[in-house]
């Protein structure tokens, strides 16, 4: 005669009986786009090239945007220039 109580069988709660065994996947990974897309159009350049009007800048030509590219956008605030990647 067996006086021991019957032992309960414990099964893993994470496994589904009869289901395939696959490793758990983490959250989906999103790739960041390399190019920015804006809903509004980027700002247009204002007055370009002051030439010899600026003291100390004589002889550099009228294409001042090479030296000071922000001068072409002097009508905008810094945060607007940064928003469009100009600075």
Swiss-Prot record:
Biased composition (Basic and acidic residues): 1-12
E.C. numbers: 3.1.4.35
Reaction catalysis annotation: 3',5'-cyclic GMP + H2O = GMP + H(+)
Gene Ontology CC entries for this record: photoreceptor disc membrane; photoreceptor outer segment membrane; plasma membrane
Region (Disordered): 1-55
Gene Ontology biological process: positive regulation of epidermal growth factor receptor signaling pathway; positive regulation of G protein-coupled receptor signaling pathway; positive regulation of MAPK cascade; visual perception
Swiss-Prot/TrEMBL keywords: Acetylation, cGMP, Hydrolase, Retinitis pigmentosa, Sensory transduction, Vision
GO molecular function: 3',5'-cyclic-GMP phosphodiesterase activity; cGMP binding; enzyme inhibitor activity; spectrin binding
Enzyme class: hydrolase
Biased composition (Basic residues): 26-44
Gene3D superfamilies the record matches: Retinal cGMP phosphodiesterase, gamma subunit (4.10.1120.10)
Transmembrane segments: none
Modification N-acetylmethionine, positions: 1
InterPro entries: PDE6_gamma, PDE6_gamma_sf
Function noted in UniProt: Participates in processes of transmission and amplification of the visual signal. cGMP-PDEs are the effector molecules in G-protein-mediated phototransduction in vertebrate rods and cones.
Disease: Retinitis pigmentosa 57: A retinal dystrophy belonging to the group of pigmentary retinopathies. Retinitis pigmentosa is characterized by retinal pigment deposits visible on fundus examination and primary loss of rod photoreceptor cells followed by secondary loss of cone photoreceptors. Patients typically have night vision blindness and loss of midperipheral visual field. As their condition progresses, they lose their far peripheral visual field and eventually central vision as well.
Family, per entry: Belongs to the rod/cone cGMP-PDE gamma subunit family.
Subunit structure: Oligomer composed of two catalytic chains (alpha and beta), an inhibitory chain (gamma) and the delta chain.
Name of this protein: Retinal rod rhodopsin-sensitive cGMP 3',5'-cyclic phosphodiesterase subunit gamma
The organism of origin for this protein: Homo sapiens
Lineage: Eukaryota, Metazoa, Chordata, Craniata, Vertebrata
